[in-house]
């Protein structure tokens, strides 16, 4: 296990910069998830740490040693990819042991490491099976076991669950979390799935167009998003974000309604409200008028999708699962003043109150 340090890491292709100066420290034993939409640079950043992509500027340190010029095999890391890449003619045991045999470790050491990883990943019943006799989730566990038996300084995972169905992803998330708790392995994990990111990470790197928009704990990212991009990306349904005109402790909403709110400054602002931080207004209470277009019922909860009255600005509300509201109904929603998010309309950065 080891600390990973990124110091102003940059990547360019033909003069076009795709990774823009990322600096962070991943502590020994920490589980950090890089999350963002397709094309944001998350896999490129992981591959730079692994040595599969050259670093254009800045440095990467693993275990206190700058590794910019080292080959992947010299960095003491192990990787797990989206595709399992198991040898089809080898058993689970042989797949997990193969790298150790190439490294010429003693047979007893190889057997001990494979047995330890198989126990941790609940693979003992499958050690003599070929990959074709395994489910997708079992194959992915074999790929992880093959990485773990090497006992690397750091474990890097690139979208390891994206080929699995929804039920298997939930199961594998739990197993990955339990595996990390047992091993204390320094882990860098890439995903586009915010649920994976929020449930697995000690800290998140939220990326957008090669920029680390925010590096923080999942709770901090959710409760205090550093930018409008982060606010809209993390959370499901996404945060409602729209432009308001602020002045003298009130905001004028799209459609013309006026709402008293504590504002950080006057002028145009971008206001963010999560669906769960809106409640139905009491009679005579100033509120956001919303006309529903549809209601999505999920059992315990329901979500109402509509528009702010008098505008084309979309709005999502969380409703009780027993709600009888339907298309065309008008709802007056009041935001929780403790959960207001304001963003600069030009830079998109968070404005503190």
From Swiss-Prot:
Origin superkingdom: Bacteria
Pfam families membership: ABC_tran (PF00005), TOBE_2 (PF08402)
Xref: CDD domains: ABC_MalK_N (cd03301)
Catalytic activity, reaction form: sn-glycerol 3-phosphate(out) + ATP + H2O = sn-glycerol 3-phosphate(in) + ADP + phosphate + H(+)
Any GO BP annotation: carbohydrate transport
UniProt KW keywords: ATP-binding, Cell inner membrane, Cell membrane, Membrane, Nucleotide-binding, Sugar transport, Translocase, Transport
Location of this chain's protein in the cell: Cell inner membrane
Membrane topology: Peripheral membrane protein
Enzyme Commission number(s): 7.6.2.10
Domain ABC transporter: 4-234
Family (UniProt): Belongs to the ABC transporter superfamily. sn-glycerol-3-phosphate importer (TC 3.A.1.1.3) family.
Subunit architecture: The complex is composed of two ATP-binding proteins (UgpC), two transmembrane proteins (UgpA and UgpE) and a solute-binding protein (UgpB).
UniProt-recorded name of the protein: sn-glycerol-3-phosphate import ATP-binding protein UgpC
Origin organism lineage: Bacteria, Pseudomonadati, Pseudomonadota, Alphaproteobacteria, Rhodobacterales
């Amino acid at each position: 296990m080891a600390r990973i340090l990124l110091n102003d890491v940059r990547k360019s292709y033909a003069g076009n910069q795709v990774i823009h100066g990322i600096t962070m420290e991943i502590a020994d034993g920490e589980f950090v998830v890089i999350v963002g939409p397709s094309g944001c640079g998350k896999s490129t950043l992981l591959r730079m740490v692994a040595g599969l992509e050259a670093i254009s500027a800045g440095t990467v340190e693993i275990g206190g040693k700058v590794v910019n010029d080292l080959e992947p095999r010299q960095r003491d890391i192990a990787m797990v990819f989206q595709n399992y890449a198991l040898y089809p003619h080898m058993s689970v045991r042989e797949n997990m042991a193969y790298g150790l045999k190439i490294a010429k470790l003693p047979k007893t050491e190889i057997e001990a490491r494979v047995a330890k990883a198989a126990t941790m990943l609940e693979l003992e019943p499958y050690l003599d099976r070929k990959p074709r006799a395994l489910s997708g989730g079992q194959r992915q566990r074999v790929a992880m076991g093959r990485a773990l038996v090497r006992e690397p300084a750091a474990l890097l995972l690139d979208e390891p669950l994206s080929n699995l169905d929804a039920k298997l992803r939930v199961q594998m998330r739990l197993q990955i979390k339990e595996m990390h708790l047992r091993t204390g392995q320094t882990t860098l994990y890439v995903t586009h799935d915010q649920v994976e990111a929020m449930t697995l990470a000690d800290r998140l790197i939220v990326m957008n167009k090669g920029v680390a928009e925010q590096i923080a704990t999942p709770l901090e990212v959710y409760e205090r998003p550093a930018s409008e991009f982060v606010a809209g990306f993390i959370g499901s349904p996404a945060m409602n974000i729209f432009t308001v005109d602020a002045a003298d402790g009130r905001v004028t909403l799209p459609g013309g309604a006026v709402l008293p709110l504590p504002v950080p400054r006057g002028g145009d602002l971008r206001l963010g409200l999560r669906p769960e931080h809106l409640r139905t207004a009491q009679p005579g209470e100033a509120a956001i008028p919303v006309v529903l277009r549809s209601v999505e019922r999920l059992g315990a909860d329901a979500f109402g999708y509509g528009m702010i009255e008098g505008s084309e600005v979309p709005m999502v509300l969380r409703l009780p699962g027993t709600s009888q509201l339907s298309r065309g109904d008008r709802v007056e929603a009041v935001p929780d003043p403790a959960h207001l998010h304001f963003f600069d309309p030009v830079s998109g950065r968070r404005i503190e109150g």
